[in-house]
Amino acid sequence: FGHPAKDMTLSEAAMIAGIIPAPSAWDPAISPDKAKERWERVLGLMVEDGWVSQADADAAVFPETIDPDSLNRESMQGTNGYLIAHIKQELVNSGAFFEDQITQGGLRITTTIVKERQDEAVAAAQTMNSVNGWDPAHQHVALSSIDPNTGEILAEYGGPDYEQRQQNAVTQDIAMAGSAFKPFALLANARQGGTVNDTYSGASPQTFPGLVEPVTNDGGYSFGNVTLVKATAYSMNTPYVALNRDIGPETTMQAAVDAGIPQETLGLNDQLLNVLGSASPHNIDLATAYATIANGGQRVEPHIVRQVTNSGGSNKLYETTVAPTRVFEAEEVSSIMPALEAVTTGEGTADSVAGALRGFTTAGKTGTSSDQLSAQFVGFVPNMVTAVSMYQSDDDGNSVPLENIGGLDQFHGGDWPVDVWTNYMQNATKSLTEKDFTWIVKSNRNSKNNAPSSVPAPTQEPTQEASNPEPTYEPTRAPEPEPTQTATPGNGGGNGGGGNGGGNGGGGNGGGNGGGGNGGGNGGGGNGGGNGGGGGGGGGANPGAAGGN
């Protein structure tokens, strides 16, 4: 509006309030009719609640806004705009600078971004533009790549053009973790002396105390007794819910928080089905948590700024301090690695990864929304962790399923997200010299058989497996209730059932049985946004279901 917030009129304030749930979708510069519709709604509600009189509301005139194209924003165009906005927000959040100090010049800012890695990330993410059925205006890719030893963000793809969408897919959008949450149960189990060679029943369905509906594996496939290595590779649900019952879901939640999932993450809870990924973290949060594993149990904070000096470089004004915090013992993390490595080899849900990065020890986990609102893969090699998330939104920013993409019947974390991850990592890892994790130590744990003495005979096994049972309490989708709308055009979709070991639903290598849900939250914005983000891509509701591959 061209003036300070304290000088806003009733009309201006009503317009701002109206577009908060989805500012990119309802921006008056992009959708003036929608912005005016929202403005009228706010004024009507203010009259109903007694905040303004009917006469004042009738006299209000829809406000004029400054044409964003008239502003000097060339530097914010394209993919670099997301980096610049992230840098500004990180420095403001540090408390060392005001925004005016950053924008008015006179500072030399050194970032952690490696140009070659950034170019490779952009190229890899934008390979989706050539996929039949992919529409970058509504379908979104988030990619973050970090050094697990320092937390330095090496590359970040937050979207194709910041001027078109001021919502960073990496730091602001959210998506249910789905089966990408399962490694935290492995860590919690390791803390209690468990091992990935512990055995559980893979039978499906299975009933559990406190749940009205039985838990099932993807497509209804039933297995015999399986180790947690196989349960992870195939992303089975029933063994993981049984494991979570034994160790206590509160310990799984705590392991996730210790690894790097923020305590305030939407959907994070201590319920039995949290192991299936009811939490909806940002892409960068998952990358951070997996970096803790890749760093042998030491957590570091992700950051994009290395240091700030005056324009001449002679006076250092700010420097990011790297202070690793040990949250898991190296032996505990070492003990779960066989399960995460199995995901990227053999019949794992990301089995193409190891072959594409020959010579490297690879590990990770896929995740898919049960109704295909999102899909992702978080994988790592020594000294590099990369998370890839994909999701879709409609014109109003609501999450909608990823359908009819590339000729596939279903969209899974083990499909395009793994392809983009591999495309990026094949080039990005050329500069890495370490092929194996140097912190790995021998684990002498005794395995336990936790399976019942009698289980149903296994049905024929699919080539890949995941899963996604639904909780009895969910108003949103597979495992966890979601808010009805998000703050900004966010990545609503979650990771639930489906594909490559996906969710609870039939079809293909996965599928998904999750119910729909309304995601979102009020927040978003800035570095890491807030508890906002919201539904698929362009801004709205419905982050996806959990529990999938």
Map each language-model feature to its residues.
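Second-shell loop/turn segments in exported
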Residues: F1-P4, P23-D33, V42-L43, V47, ...
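Non-catalytic, structured segments within soluble enzyme domains
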Residues: F1-T112, D119, P262-Q263, L272-L276, ...
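Extracytoplasmic/secreted proteins, especially bacterial periplasmic and envelope-associated proteins
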Residues: H3, S11-M15, K34-V47, G78, ...
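Conserved catalytic neighborhood of penicillin-recognizing serine enzymes
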Residues: H3-K6, R73-E74, G194-T252, R299, ...
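A penicillin-recognizing enzyme superfamily signal
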Residues: T111-W134, L143-S145, E156, Y162-M176, ...
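Active-site rim segments in enzyme catalytic domains, especially the processed small/beta chain
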Residues: N168, Q172-L211
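Mid-domain, small-residue-enriched loop/turn segments at the edges of structured enzyme/sensor domains
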Residues: V212-T216, G248-T288
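Proline/serine/threonine-rich low-complexity "mucin-like" segments in extracytoplasmic/periplasmic regions
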Residues: W439-N549
